Each structure stands twice: as C-alpha cells, then as structure tokens.
Amino acid sequence: MAISSTINKVSLNIADMDRHYYQTHELTVAQHPSETDFRFMMRIIAFIFNAEENLAFTKGLCVDDEPEIWRKSLSNEIELWIDFGQLDEKRIGKACGRANKVIVYTYNERKAKIWWEQQADKLQRYKNLKVYFIKAESVDQLISRNMSLQCNIQDGELYLSDNDNSFDITVQKFK
C-alpha cells in the first residue's frame, strides 16, 4: 500500500518591504512522502519571496510537465514557473519555452555551487530565467501540520518565525 502525502495547513503573514506587499495567505500544501521537511520548507520560502494573489502550488513532484509553484493568467498562460533543485537543461529549456518568467531555487550549498558551475554557460541563453540559491539552515524545525509563520522581507533578506523559532534566510542570485 502506497504512503499518502502529508497535508499541512500553512498560514503566512507576509510583510515584504522590498515589493510593498502585505498579505496573509492561508494555504493547504501537500508534502510528498519522499520529500524531506527541509525541501518542503524551501517550497514555502519560495512562495513567500514570490507571494501574490494568483500564485499557487501545483501537483509538483508527481507531474513532470508542471512546475512546483506557478502563476497563471486568466487566459491560462503560465506567467511564472518556479522549480527547485539542480535541474537539467532540458527541463529548464522546456519551462522557459512555456512560461513568461522562470525561477529555479537551489538549496544545498555544495551541490548547488557544483551544479551552477556546470550549467552557468548553458543557461545564459535563457533570457526569462533567474536562478537563486537559498541559504536557510535548520528551517525544517518550523514544520508542523498547522504552521503559522511571520514572514518579513527587507533588503532581500527574509526573517521567518513562528512562536518558538526565528531564522534569517538569505537568497544569492546566480543568474
């Protein structure tokens, strides 16, 4: 019998001073059985950095031809495609062809730097692509089935906290 996904309720109170975006998002987010708590939190962090009304989680790990987070227009065009990890150029190229803007977030420092050294030249041709490295150690301590997070962004840095923990999260732009 297959293990089912864990369903997490996530309340995000976002104050993004860089974009002048102030909103609360009440989300229901599935965590795939093979997904680590740390990777799940990377998805939440990426959502926070890009938060807006029509941003949504997709089926993610289960579907090859969709990103993990996206924003679609009213005419069903993919305006923003967000993916994670050390992706191959083929997937990135496909995403850049289907979406107006593509963001790839990497999060394992050693692996991310090696991957970027190998991919940087190949990926320069994609003008609608941005690649970032998220430095967010121990954020998996925040995970619970019902999360309520305070999210403050200023000068590109995220201050993420719940009732018991707080973390400074930085994002480094690769491309």
PLM feature spans:
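Helix-rich interaction surfaces within compact, conserved domain-sized segments
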Residues: 2-32, 103-107, 111-174
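Acidic-basic catalytic patches of nuclease active cores, encompassing PD-(D/E)XK
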Residues: 16-61
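Short, well-ordered coil/turn elements that cap or connect secondary structure elements
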Residues: 52, 97, 124-126
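Long amphipathic N-terminal alpha/beta scaffold segment
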Residues: 56-64, 70-74
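Conserved catalytic cores of phosphodiester-cleaving nucleases, focusing on short active-site segments
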Residues: 69-71, 76-92
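A short acidic, amphipathic alpha-helical/loop segment
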Residues: 91-95, 118
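Short glycine-/polar-rich loops that comprise or flank the Walker A/P-loop
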Residues: 99-101
